[in-house]
Amino acid sequence: MQTVWKFPLQIGGVWEVEMPSHAEILSLALQGDDLFFWARVETRNGVVRRRFLVVGTGHEIPHYAEKFLGTVHLKNGLVFHAFEI
């Protein structure tokens, strides 16, 4: 069955998230003060670990940052950018 699941991310640093294989990331946003992304998943697929990086504006983006996911603006004015690595 295909459905949309919500996954938490932390701001700053590299994070591993377990999710069904071949999940398609749809969007990234703040919900309250927390960062999440939403993905279309096939619930019958096996689980894999995927890695994500969240960096602030002006911080170095490593060469291995493969896919840009989106940008979020915090209430305090800071801006962060999420990548899959």
Where do the PLM segments sit?
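Helix-rich interaction surfaces within compact, conserved domain-sized segments
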Residues: 47-85
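Extracellular interaction modules
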Residues: 31-38, 77
